[in-house]
Design a protein with these regions (language model features):
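Conserved ATP-binding/catalytic motifs of P-loop helicase motor domains
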Residues: 1-231
Length: 231
């Protein structure tokens, strides 16, 4: 499942509501919340994907967690989990998603062909935000690059490239998309229109003029034509 929406449409509130529902119904042990960054994880009271995978900043040290099907700690962590909320999906890369899929399949003792070990995956946020670092975004299309590489003498794929090329099959399993469109944070119609244009890279001169009026402090007018802003 995928729940996209621009800023201010209530995505974080929805995640909190889902968490509250699982807590009140005594099923919070069936829910896992993950995010690609520490800030995003703190926002929804979750943990980072890298921490959950047992990966530090130096990925040269391979995680021992993923390759041990009989590891009790790993099995206990996922024994009752049925739902994964994956926040900030724009920053989640294909390789990262593939590694998460491998870990869950190992923990659940599932066929590797079973998506996410049979667990329901719910992606949140907005594709039109920060892209993943040193990874391909979830919407990346390999068809063009594969055609080009076929004509050239393509080298053997690395483990990271294999993960990236296999992960799109996971995305294609999404069979439900709920788009959040109602803006809950901003009621100013002109400012909302500005945000929509800037989000899509379609800003106009009037947007710049409007932003110049959003100055903190009464009577404080600063020109962008004056130093140091014009440098």
């Amino acid at each position: 499942m995928c729940v996209p929406g621009c800023g201010g449409t209530g995505k974080s509130q929805l995640i909190r509501a889902i968490t509250a529902y699982f807590t009140q119904t005594n099923r919070v042990h069936k829910l896992r919340k993950l995010a690609p960054t520490l800030v995003a994880a703190a926002e929804i009271e979750s943990m980072t994907i890298h921490s959950f995978l047992g990966e530090g900043r130096n990925r040269k040290k391979k995680s021992k967690t993923i390759d041990r099907p009989g590891q009790t700690k790993l099995e206990n962590a996922w024994r009752f989990v049925e739902y994964i909320i994956l926040d900030e999906m724009s920053m989640v890369g294909l390789s990262l998603l593939a590694r998460l899929n491998k870990l869950v399949a190992t923990a659940k003792h599932c066929d590797p062909m079973t998506t996410m070990g049979g667990i329901n995956l719910i992606l949140f946020r907005d594709y039109i935000q920060y892209s993943p670092v040193f990874d391909k975004p979830l919407y990346y299309n390999f068809s063009t690059t594969m055609d080009n590489n076929t004509t050239n003498n393509r080298k053997l794929s690395t483990e990271n490239e294999i993960q990236q090329e296999s992960a799109p099959a996971l995305i294609l399993q999404i069979n439900c998309v709920v788009i959040l469109e109602q803006q809950m944070r901003t009621k100013d119609l002109a400012y909302r229109a500005l945000l929509d244009r800037v989000r899509n890279g379609e800003g106009i001169h009037e947007d710049w003029l409007l932003l110049r009026t959003r100055v903190v402090g009464i009577g404080l007018h600063i020109s962008l034509n004056d130093p140091p802003w014009n440098q």
